[in-house]
Amino acid sequence: MINTCALKNYLEKSQKKESPAKETIVTSLNRSLSTPPSHLEGILLINKPKGKTSFSLVRDLRKRLGVKKIGHAGTLDPFATGVMVMLVGRNYTRLSDQFLLSDKEYIAEAYLGVVTDSYDCEGQVLSQSNIIPTLEQIKEAFSLFQGKIEQVPPMFSAKKQQGKKLYELARQGIVVERQPVKISIHTELLSYNYPYLNFRIECSKGTYIRSIAYDLGTKLGCGAHLSNLTRTRSGAFCLENCLNGAEIHTVTNLEQNLIRND
C-alpha cells in the first residue's frame, strides 16, 4: 500500500511503466496547488469491485471522508473491476482532464460466438455463431490490433452526436453512423479456451475495450462480446497499490492512504 507521500515524487520515482501524460500531470499539479492542500485532499487508489458503479464509489467516499468535491480519472462499467484513480478535494478534481489523458492497461476476456448490442455481457444478444476459430486464426487476428489504428465508438457510449449521447440514442433503438477515432494499442494473447479468449491490452485515451472484443469477433467471423474486464494500470498507478473498494467503509484511517503533493 502507498502511504501518504508527495505525488510529484511518486510519479517521478515510480518504477512502474510511465504514462505519456506524466509530465503534463506534474506540471499541472505545480500550477494548481498554489495553496497547501488540506489533509483531506489527494489521490486515493481504489480497486473497484464487480457490480458497483463508478459513481457509487464517489458517493461512498463522500460519505466516508465528508468531502463533497470527489471525482475520478476514468470510469469503469459495473461488471468491470480494477484501478479507479479517485480525486479528492478541489485541487485534485480540477486535474481530472489531465489524468484522463493517461494511457491504461487492462486484462480482458472476450466471449466468442455471441454478439450483443452493447458489445459486452450486459447487453441483449443479437446473434450467435457455431464457428470455432483456430489458435492460428486467433493469433492472426491479434496481429491486426497493434500500434495506431482507427476504432469506431460503440453506440452504447457517452460520446455525443446530434447533441445527444450515443447511449441515449441506442436506448431509443436509434443507430447512427459514427466516425472512427485514432487510438494507439498493444495487445497480447494470454490464453484461448473456446469460447473464452483472454488478452492484455495497453491503450491510449478513448479506447473502448468493448469495441476491441467486438472487432476481434468480426475479424474471426464468429462474433464476440466483452465478458470480463480488469483495469490493471491507469497512468503510473497500478492495481497492486489499490485499496479494496468493497472495504471502504471498514478501512481505518482511510485518509492516510491519500497520495498528495505536500
UniProtKB/Swiss-Prot annotation:
Keyword Isomerase among UniProt keywords: yes
Keyword annotations: Isomerase, tRNA processing
GO biological process terms held by the UniProt record: mRNA pseudouridine synthesis; tRNA pseudouridine synthesis
Source superkingdom: Bacteria
Organism of origin: Protochlamydia amoebophila (strain UWE25)
Entry's family note: Belongs to the pseudouridine synthase TruB family. Type 1 subfamily.
Function as written in the Swiss-Prot or TrEMBL entry: Responsible for synthesis of pseudouridine from uracil-55 in the psi GC loop of transfer RNAs.
Protein name: tRNA pseudouridine synthase B
